[in-house]
């Protein structure tokens, strides 16, 4: 199966979705991530679990996480 950006999250083979421990128990507005077998990272909306998944390379995901950690996206 070819993994592509925007494909239905339900079509991703054998993935374990995770969300932040800071997410509330009701779920609803959470982002979930899954590491794919080839090292890419898929991201989906927990409200629409069968909806589209965004797929990032490991380098793209590392850059995003690093930017978030460093405050690059903080509003001033």
PLM features: residue spans?
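Boundary-flanking segments of nucleic-acid-binding domains in nuclear regulatory proteins
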Residues: 4, 36-37, 48, 72-76
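N-terminal first-folded block
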Residues: 1-30
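Mixed-charge, Lys/Arg-enriched low-complexity segments
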Residues: 56-76
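Residue-level signal for pocket-adjacent positions within structured domains
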Residues: 7, 12, 49-51, 68
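A short, structured beta-strand/loop element
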Residues: 20-59, 63
């Amino acid at each position: 199966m070819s993994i592509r950006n925007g494909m239905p999250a339900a079509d991703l083979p054998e993935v374990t979705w995770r969300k932040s421990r800071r997410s509330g128990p009701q779920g609803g507005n959470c982002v979930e991530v899954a590491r794919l077998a080839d090292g890419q990272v898929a991201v989906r909306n927990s409200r629409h679990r069968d909806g589209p998944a965004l797929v990032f390379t490991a380098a793209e995901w590392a850059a995003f996480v690093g930017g978030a950690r460093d405050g690059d996206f903080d509003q001033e």
